[in-house]
């Protein structure tokens, strides 16, 4: 049975990535696309690379008839999804790609996002969408909150190590490099080619990046006590991709073994042989995560390197993976795409 899909916020990067992936999904059909500022336009006018697809025109959200929609992806900007999802039919399954429902604690949301949550009841209902760790909850969920792309990368490298008890919880450092598409499609001076090309810079440094809220929430939940990591992201002049260097105290072989055993049966998570390190070029355009482990010159320390595509596994691909579970489909349906190389 083919499921009818609506994509709200289809004129942004994550919305376009949803369209690209769902176009070849055997059990999903796009029946509605929203883009309020571009309502009435064809998707091919906004994204010419989608010209060959037969897609509905962009509409305003209030113009969409949700009575025939089985699931909606909400790819709207942060702080916008709360009111929009609150107004959707209560029986409609929703996967939200924004930050609006990732944090379970209303106080934590206000701390990291600077304003009270406008839909606290939905915040309590939402299931955190890190698929490989919440798939049972996701199967029965009505609302799933997509993870932050940086938060997902770091968690794939660290969560099994906390679960296995093989690292010092008080000494975790994440040094992360991210592609520019993670900053969205709106015009910003610092994202102009002349400003960004041939350079890289740290941003939201000093413990200010909002994805730290997800690290705090998830790592503390696993450990059963507060866990805080040090995390600094860097913006790099590539379109797609995230590379996280994670520095931990723990036996390197034990670290590698914990990751390899935890992800042995996972479709999209691959742990490389000990000493091999991954590259963002090898997962570009795909839903795969590659993880490598190497020892450090300091005895008893290890470095874990994780890479993923921020638009795919870090956002839209993972959203479809979650939607597959919510709709009773094969979790990997429509997502077994080979990476784009070179």
From Swiss-Prot:
EC number: 1.2.1.38
Pathway: Amino-acid biosynthesis; L-arginine biosynthesis; N(2)-acetyl-L-ornithine from L-glutamate: step 3/4
Pfam families per record: Semialdhyde_dh (PF01118), Semialdhyde_dhC_1 (PF22698)
Recorded superkingdom: Bacteria
GO molecular function list: N-acetyl-gamma-glutamyl-phosphate reductase activity; NAD binding; NADP+ binding
Swiss-Prot/TrEMBL GO biological process terms: L-arginine biosynthetic process
GO CC annotation, single: cytoplasm
Chief localization: cytoplasm
Location(s) in or outside the cell: Cytoplasm
Disulfide cysteine pairs (residue numbers): none
Enzyme class: oxidoreductase
Keyword set, alphabetical order: Amino-acid biosynthesis, Arginine biosynthesis, Cytoplasm, NADP, Oxidoreductase
SMART domains: Semialdhyde_dh (SM00859)
Reactions performed catalytically: N-acetyl-L-glutamate 5-semialdehyde + phosphate + NADP(+) = N-acetyl-L-glutamyl 5-phosphate + NADPH + H(+)
Keyword match Protease: no
Oxidoreductase in keyword set: yes
Primary role: Catalyzes the NADPH-dependent reduction of N-acetyl-5-glutamyl phosphate to yield N-acetyl-L-glutamate 5-semialdehyde.
Protein name (Swiss-Prot/TrEMBL): N-acetyl-gamma-glutamyl-phosphate reductase
